[in-house]
Amino acid sequence: MPRRVRAQKRTAGVVEDEEVKAEQVRREHKAKQKQAVGSDAEQEEEELFPDSLHGPDSESDVTDDEQIDEEARQADRDLLKELVTLQGLNGEDPSDADNDDDDDEEEAASDDDDEEEDAEPSSDSSNEASDAGQEEGTTDPHTTTDDKASATTQMVVYSSDDDTSDEEHSLNRVGRIPMEWYEDYEHIGYDLNGKRIRKPKQKDRLEKFLDAFEAGNNGRTIYDPVTGKEIELTDDDINMIKRIQSGQLPDTGINPYEDYVDFFTHEKMQTPVVDKPEPKRRFVPSKWEHKKIMKIVRSIRKGLIKLPTSDDEKDKSSEEEQYYDVWGNEDDPNDPRIKVRQANHIAAPKVALPHHAESYNPPEEYLPTDAEAEKWRNAHEDDRERNYLPHKYGSLRLVPAYDQYIQERFHRCLDLYLCPRARRIRMNVDPEDLLPKLPKPEDLQPFPSAPSLVYRGHKARVTSISCDPTGQWLVSGSDDKTIRVWEISTGRCVRVVTVDAEVNMVAWCPNAGVSIVAVAHGHTVSLICPRVATAAIDKATAVLCNQSIEKPSQGAEEGMRATPTWNRIRGERQDQDGIFFEIPHHAEVMQVTWHHKGNYFASVMPRAETQSVCVHSLNRQSTQHPFQKRNRDVQRVLFHPTQPLFFVATKTHVRVYNLQAQALVKKLLTGVRWLSSLAIHPAGDNLIIGSYDKRLCWFDMDLSIKPYKILRYHKYALRQVCFHKKYPIFASCGDDGNVHVLHGMVYNDLGQNPLIVPVKIIKAHNQTSDGMGVMDCTFHPSQPWLFSAGSDGSIKLHV
């Protein structure tokens, strides 16, 4: 017989003997405890089942009861030691068996004698252990045929109340706690006997690498922080991990989509599905109901609850039989309540009389045309003037039933009982008194009111105009890819420059010492010298543009676009057209605007994914991108006239940034859907915006982030708004072909609100077939004159 089987049998017999001894000690101790007076259940339970992991007390003087407890605990410890020994035999390494071959030969004779003596106890104990294991249900399904004897013993060793515990097969008994608590100690926990488990030697990366090649496990080894050992995963574990990673169930034997069987609506069965015995509480009177009833009985005895008598029941029945007619005195004219009600009665409003269009044979002028009928059908119910279409019938008998009759009666009933009626005293107030007292427009002159000159020459719509600081010249850009310079006083075109794309905007440099025009066309911004100023100004402009500046290497950072390069134009284009620089951009440029000192100008690319705003330095001939985040909503930008503030207008908001602090100062809430234009007062405290939804908003930035005034006087979208630099007037133009001139006085007193008065509506240009009207407008720098650019290709001066 193999040594392992013999050892298992001997150990099983020892285990059985130790169990019998422990049971006898417990019975004796229990008998003595029953004789003791004043013992409670909790103390008896604690003494019967002591903690086997702790050693006995070190006290020398013990009583008889404590001696019995000590014997019981010693028996439990001996039993646990044998179980640990048995576990070591079951999990021993085959190499240990090979090393102990000599010991097996020496102990062969003694083993045979032990087998004869322990044959019956071993068989009995093994049978009892197997029966106990079957009752507990702790048999390992992976046990092989060679380990049948050890499996029966293991069922005794690992019997536990919690079959799902992860510590049953682990030597470390610290429980489910974070193992980080043992990082600063030399041990990682405690074994079954309460002894410390020292940390194994940690391998470095080289040793782990060599072990992986020597073992040949293909990276299947994982580290167990509870035991401090490396565990090799089996094929079943690898397959389970792969199934979990792919979102499947870990166990392949589980079918999550089994056919549903309805036990209670299927065929009738002979035996019930659930037939548990009735619990005892179904046959025993409820203790809690008894307490509630006794509480009510005590309240009745104390007089807190009074039971109804027979007289009370008669009175109650007589009261229930009495009825009251709420409408019985409605016909009594002497009732004072009826008189008050009739005096305060308000008659219901009468139904509106039918109109001529509701006739079955209306006149011809009341019958809608096909276009009007189609427009009525496409309109919303709330937008329709009437809820029916007039029809003409030859006779009354041909008129069909009115399909809106029930709906109208229903709304009439709602109006009668849901709408409250009240008497209101009509106030005799003149509507003119409700309007604010505004000064007369004649008292607010000067302002432009009449057309003076017409500048013709462009073959397509004029998109932008700008006046030079001296007020002598006017530059315009058009969709015909030309830039024209006009003399304001005579209307003569003195220079024409042709570019390679449609011109979106032109802006004259506000510095009177140089003569430079920034032109946005296509993906390029060009700097042009018109050469219409004096010789000294043209020379200063040439010196500024031709100066050589050492530039750093321009490269793109990671994830960003490269900085635009300033391409210097030389030769014939510079001599004839006056183009000094061309700055290419990565998207179409829709706006250019200058700083009030003329050293910087900004360009806007609304369709760019990133870096939609560029700030260019004329003196340094360089470009910066102040905003790196993705923003495709930027429509307009503007420099503050006196402070280092930068306005960035998106479709619905206006953000104000401080260029020195590089921080957001405030965010203005416009309330519009799509912003189109932006202008700031020369003092810098007030701002106006125009939008494509026909609104003009005036912002007092010292007052609030919301509009101070919202003006809705344009019939179509607004294209441009502008302030005069000297006079308290501002203007707006739109696709309706009109230019509105308004008086806007800003007072130095911060406690007084700005005064806004409409003074003139100028019919400047005709609306073209594409729905465009006035594209741009600007004021003369020193005179109360207004220039307007129309989609009809003309430019007009209003004085």
UniProtKB/Swiss-Prot annotation:
Primary site of residence: nucleus
Biased composition (Low complexity): 122-132
InterPro entries in the record: BOP1/Erb1, BOP1_N_dom, WD40/YVTN_repeat-like_dom_sf, WD40_repeat_CS, WD40_repeat_dom_sf, WD40_rpt
WD repeat start-end pairs: 457-498, 500-538, 584-626, 629-669, 670-709, 713-752, 769-799
Biased composition (Acidic residues): 58-69, 93-121
GO molecular function (one): ribonucleoprotein complex binding
Keyword Iron carried by entry: no
Entry's Gene Ontology cellular component terms: nucleoplasm; PeBoW complex; preribosome, large subunit precursor
Keyword annotations from UniProtKB, A to Z: Nucleus, Repeat, Ribosome biogenesis, rRNA processing, WD repeat
Pfam families: BOP1NT (PF08145), WD40 (PF00400)
BP-aspect Gene Ontology terms: maturation of 5.8S rRNA from tricistronic rRNA transcript (SSU-rRNA, 5.8S rRNA, LSU-rRNA); maturation of LSU-rRNA from tricistronic rRNA transcript (SSU-rRNA, 5.8S rRNA, LSU-rRNA)
Family that this chain belongs to: Belongs to the WD repeat BOP1/ERB1 family.
Function (record text): Required for maturation of ribosomal RNAs and formation of the large ribosomal subunit.
PANTHER family in UniProt: RIBOSOME BIOGENESIS PROTEIN BOP1 (PTHR17605:SF0), RIBOSOME BIOGENESIS PROTEIN BOP1 BLOCK OF PROLIFERATION 1 PROTEIN (PTHR17605)
Protein name, UniProt field: Ribosome biogenesis protein BOP1 homolog
Lineage: Eukaryota, Choanoflagellata, Craspedida, Salpingoecidae, Monosiga
